[in-house]
């Protein structure tokens, strides 16, 4: 009995000791400086300024130094960049960019489009906050079809091409767009479907051509000499007559009994 009580009280003592040991570790963190902060309310500076310079955020295009080479469009492995060029109506020798769309929601931020750009027109920014109600609002259109921009002519001797501050164009777009605005229509409306053609009425069968008149008999040719008659063929031998079948013998009639002379 004493051992049972001693074991019971020892179990209670171990439980209380382990409880306060774990709680002391938790309480020790209350006096420490937190290593995490609540985003985005309590950051000491904008998060984009805390990111490394080579961070790959939203893509930005400086149309002032874009050559329209479409190297970025060809390098994109998922086809999120669409570029269209046309000749300027006023100057046919000058090409203009009528479409430069980047689907930021589809982009995988690989950076392959930035590497082949000869002037650095397209660059990754440190902007990443793009919360929108409609995903189509993340398709950035850097060219206006109604007001296209001319392509930039590259200076082969230039070592640097000045551009606008990196991230300023994307930041301006994100700040002016409401998160719940209606989705734009990027695709042209579908052309109306042509009306189904009714089957044409069957044409009446063509009249049969009239029978041609019989041709006039040709002039009788002079009678040819009669051909010599062929010798008559020898008559074929008559087929041998089959032997007549023997007549069936009729059964003989029974003989009449002889008359008894004593019966007279």
UniProtKB/Swiss-Prot annotation:
InterPro entries: 4Fe4S_Fe-S-bd, 4Fe4S_Fe_S_CS, NADH_quinone_OxRdtase_chainI. Keywords: 4Fe-4S, Cell inner membrane, Cell membrane, Iron, Iron-sulfur, Membrane, Metal-binding, NAD, Quinone, Repeat, Translocase, Ubiquinone. [4Fe-4S] cluster 2 binds at residues 76, 107, 110, 113. Its EC number is 7.1.1.-. It catalyses: a quinone + NADH + 5 H(+)(in) = a quinol + NAD(+) + 4 H(+)(out). Binds 2 [4Fe-4S] clusters per subunit. GO terms for cellular component: plasma membrane. It comes from the Bacteria. Residues 183-264 are annotated as: Disordered. It is a peripheral membrane protein. It is found in: Cell inner membrane. NDH-1 is composed of 14 different subunits. Subunits NuoA, H, J, K, L, M, N constitute the membrane sector of the complex. This is NADH-quinone oxidoreductase subunit I 2. It comes from Anaeromyxobacter dehalogenans (strain 2CP-C).
